[in-house]
A protein has these predicted regions:
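Generic structural signal for short, solvent-exposed loop/turn connectors between secondary structure elements
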Residues: 1, 72-73, 77, 87-98, ...
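A broad, low-specificity signal marking well-ordered, structured residues that form hydrophobic/aromatic
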Residues: 1-3, 14, 99, 122, ...
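Non-heme Fe(II)/2-oxoglutarate
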Residues: 1-93
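Short beta-strand-to-loop capping motifs
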Residues: 18, 126, 183-187
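Catalytic core of non-heme Fe(II) oxygenases with the double-stranded beta-helix
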Residues: 94-162
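Catalytic core of Fe(II)/2-oxoglutarate
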Residues: 136-203
């Protein structure tokens, strides 16, 4: 099975080497958010959708930054985030919930799944230094009964990584505390983003 590292591209991902970002700047940005901003995933989701169903597999080891608890601003409102967003040519502007900081405690893992809400994500790993465990893509259409592993990809820590959410994927148990800034959208398909990349019109 193929394992991709560094600057790479394959069927379900592409490292966007046209974008360079300052990981230390994002680390400092993340570190300003105190414990009151670190909400368990299920609690975070209800801030924006009170009827959001409880997901048992998304334990309290998986938290998201609820930025308004710090000073009333959403993540998307901060200049450091806007500077990143401006580097991409999305089909439509991102919304408030399309910018996320994800924080995972050691021992958390993602079972095989698809992203129900979005088509693509652009991942900026903040911690640990090596970017953490790889993303694994799986064959099949039923995430409850996936087929064979297709390949694994380690997120680049130099350039953001574009991934599709519509292919079954998982992440093995995390050994270290992990933090990722994620831009996501349901209004730009993976193929549209790749086509724009190929024409030099996405970044």
């Amino acid at each position: 099975m193929k394992i991709y590292t560094g600057t790479s591209s394959a069927e379900h991902h592409r490292v966007l080497d046209g974008v360079v970002w300052d990981r230390n700047e994002l680390l400092e940005f993340y570190q300003q958010f105190d414990e009151s901003c670190h909400l368990p995933w299920n609690e975070f989701k209800k801030k924006y959708n009170p009827n959001n169903p409880y997901r048992r597999t998304l334990t309290d080891k998986f938290r998201q930054i609820y930025a308004p608890n710090l000073e009333g601003r959403e993540l998307i409102d901060y200049p450091v985030v806007q500077n990143l967003i401006r580097q991409f040519n999305f089909d439509e502007p991102l919304g408030v919930t399309d910018v996320q900081i994800l924080a995972y405690e050691p021992g958390f893992s993602f079972v095989p799944h698809i992203d129900a809400e979005v088509d693509i994500s652009i991942m900026f790993p903040i911690a640990p230094d090596d970017g953490g465990e790889p993303l694994t893509f799986w064959e099949g259409d039923d995430f409850r009964n996936p087929g064979e592993m297709i390949y694994k990809v380690h997120y680049s820590t130099e350039h953001p990584t574009l991934v599709t959410g519509k292919t079954i994927h998982s992440v093995e148990e995390m050994k270290d505390y992990r933090v990722i800034l994620r831009l996501r959208t349901a209004k730009t398909s993976f193929q549209s983003a790749i086509d724009k990349c190929n024409s030099g019109n996405f970044v």
